[in-house]
């Protein structure tokens, strides 16, 4: 079919369309809000930030990258097993040798590797979901997204429920300067078409996307916001960048613009004499990477594939941006009192070069380790013993860990799934932070090997080599649910699609040796964990996921 993304250019200027569209959307947004903005999850006392002493409080940076796989940072030798990875399928435009891929991946992250080596590597760290919106919601709330009915990006399309207390709200109420820079993807949004890009048809270029008022970052605890509201944006000439509530022009390469904004945040905090909490969410290396990065990044790579070079250069642009931020922290005297919590929002997609998710099975949007086991570390110079931490942890732990580091009490009515990691990292507490972690989500082939034909044709469309937008049979909405529960020994996986149950040792990265039949008691106990998780969670917010959710419940009921 002819491109569904082609747009008719109206005679009225885009700015007027955007203004009227935003006004109309805002006027009707209140009618669509299912959950009132009143906080029912936590009771705040009547105080002002000035009642709290912020002297000596640490600065907090929650730093995320978009679709960066576990294999992109050398956390352990198993994740870089060349024999396993050399046989992995990739989209044609990214095909290079495995040795070149590993070399380029390591070359793209010198600053991040240095921070990782100086901090604590979470070698068994997982995000709470395999796709962006729910995963980011878990970071912002410290809760599994299922607790508030979010099981996929579709459930998140109406915004994360306003009853949830976002992390910056607590920091803001305790005297911190709070800022969000980069990707938001936690709002109810609306779109306004813009003229088609003449060079590429990156789907992020097709619309200006903007958030409904209630879900604006400034209404969820941030003093300042600069970035984009939806799932992604173009690397150049983005039509969807906002500074607070006003649309602003793109300035060059998006990673550089976000880095400049982050430096502005740390400078303002210095001027205000306040500690800061910065949520810095880069969009790299999210697809598509058809446009080269600026030469200072691009010239570092020569893999034999232009698109692969673009990918690694986008990662390197973030790495060098972090380097600039660290230099500014040193200049301002903030460096020694700053914490960095780093993760990718989910695993890598098949539409990228190796090493992607390393030797692990699965990709973004799946509960296999390749979808949720991400590069993750915490850096706090002089306050943490460098090294690996190998117990099960979650990005949901960032929320209580950051508050604990700032000596901010968690309100008693706030029911978190995350726990502070400081007792284990600083006080050498025995045991593990989590006995189990549970995921329920769409089991989508959107980003795995099964969908390579779509991605090959998608690149042809993006580059104007074809006017036909390819059919995608593997979207989230067309996919059944699956569940996974992990403890510190096993991973139990069930997929409705093929009615398959598998039990695997965590060391079985490819999940080839199914131990379910030989360990019925382990299976029974882990299924009980999933039942308890469902009983304490909410049903999906979207209608499209209701039947899928019920199928999971039915399968668990029949397994008793």
From Swiss-Prot:
Where are the catalytic residues?
Answer: 132, 185
Signal sequence extent:
1-29
Query: What does this protein's record comment on cofactor binding?
Result: Binds 1 Ca(2+) ion per subunit.
Q: Which cofactors does this gene product need?
A: Ca(2+)
Q: Which GO terms describe its molecular function?
A: arylsulfatase activity; metal ion binding
Reported EC number(s) for this entry are 3.1.6.-
Q: Which residues carry this modification: 3-oxoalanine (Ser)?
A: 132
What's one GO-annotated cellular component? outer membrane-bounded periplasmic space
Q: Does the keyword Cell wall biogenesis/degradation apply?
A: no
The answer to keyword Hydrolase applying to this record is yes
PTM entry text: The conversion to 3-oxoalanine (also known as C-formylglycine, FGly), of a serine or cysteine residue in prokaryotes and of a cysteine residue in eukaryotes, is critical for catalytic activity.
Name the source's superkingdom.
Bacteria
State the UniProt keywords alphabetically: Calcium, Hydrolase, Metal-binding, Signal
Q: Which residues bind Ca(2+)?
A: 66-67, 132, 345-346
Similarity remark? Belongs to the sulfatase family.
Protein name, entry field:
Uncharacterized sulfatase YdeN
Task: Give the gene symbol.
Answer: ydeN
């Amino acid at each position: 079919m002819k491109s569904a993304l082609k747009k008719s250019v109206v005679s009225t200027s885009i700015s007027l369309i955007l203004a009227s569209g935003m006004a109309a959307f805002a006027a009707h947004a209140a009618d669509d809000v299912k959950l009132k903005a009143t906080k029912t999850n936590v009771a705040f006392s009547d105080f002002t930030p000035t009642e709290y002493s912020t002297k000596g409080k640490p600065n907090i940076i929650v730093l995320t990258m978009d679709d960066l796989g576990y294999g992109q940072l050398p956390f352990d030798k198993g994740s870089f097993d060349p024999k396993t990875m050399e046989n992995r399928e990739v989209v044609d435009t990214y095909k290079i040798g495995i040795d070149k891929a590993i070399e380029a991946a390591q070359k793209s992250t010198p600053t991040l590797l240095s921070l990782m080596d100086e901090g604590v590597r979470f070698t068994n760290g997982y995000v709470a979901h395999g796709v962006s919106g729910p995963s980011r919601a878990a970071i912002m709330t410290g809760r599994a997204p299922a607790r508030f009915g979010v099981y996929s990006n579709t459930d998140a399309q109406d915004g994360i429920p306003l009853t949830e207390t976002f992390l910056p709200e607590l920091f803001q109420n305790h005297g911190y300067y709070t800022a969000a820079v980069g990707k938001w993807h936690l709002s109810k949004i609306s779109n306004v078409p813009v003229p088609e890009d003449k060079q590429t048809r990156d789907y992020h270029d097709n619309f200006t996307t903007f958030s409904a008022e209630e879900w604006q970052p400034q209404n969820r605890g941030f003093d300042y916001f600069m970035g984009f509201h939806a799932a992604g944006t173009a690397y150049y000439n983005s039509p969807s960048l906002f500074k607070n509530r006003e649309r602003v022009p793109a300035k060059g390469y998006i990673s550089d613009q976000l880095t400049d904004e982050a430096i502005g945040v740390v400078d303002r905090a210095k001027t205000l004499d306040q500690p800061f909490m910065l949520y810095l969410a880069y969009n790299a290396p999210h697809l598509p990477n058809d446009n080269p990065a600026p030469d200072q990044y691009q010239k570092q790579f020569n893999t034999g594939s232009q698109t692969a070079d673009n990918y690694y250069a986008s990662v390197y642009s973030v790495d060098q941006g972090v380097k600039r931020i660290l230099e500014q922290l040193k200049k301002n005297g903030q460096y020694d009192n700053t914490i960095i919590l780093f993760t990718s929002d989910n695993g890598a997609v098949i539409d990228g070069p190796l090493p992607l998710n390393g030797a692990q099975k699965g990709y973004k949007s799946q509960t296999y380790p390749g979808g949720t086991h991400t590069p993750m570390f915490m850096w706090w110079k002089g306050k943490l013993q460098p090294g690996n931490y190998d117990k099960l942890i979650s990005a949901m732990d960032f929320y209580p860990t950051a508050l604990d580091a700032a000596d901010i009490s968690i309100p008693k009515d706030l029911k978190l799934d995350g726990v502070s990691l400081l007792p284990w990292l600083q006080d050498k507490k025995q045991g593990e932070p989590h006995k189990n972690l549970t995921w329920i989500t769409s089991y989508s082939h959107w980003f795995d090997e099964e969908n390579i034909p779509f991605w090959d044709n998608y690149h042809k469309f993006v580059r104007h080599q074809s006017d036909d937008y390819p059919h995608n049979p593997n979207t989230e909405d067309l996919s059944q649910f699956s569940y996974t529960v992990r403890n510190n020994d096993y991973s139990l996986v069930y997929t409705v699609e093929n009615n398959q149950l598998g039990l695997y040792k965590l060391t079985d990265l490819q999940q080839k040796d199914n131990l379910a039949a030989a360990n019925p008691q382990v299976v029974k106990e882990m299924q009980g964990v999933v039942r308890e998780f469902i009983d304490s969670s909410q049903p999906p917010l979207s209608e499209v996921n209701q039947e899928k959710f019920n199928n999971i419940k039915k399968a668990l009921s029949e397994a008793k």
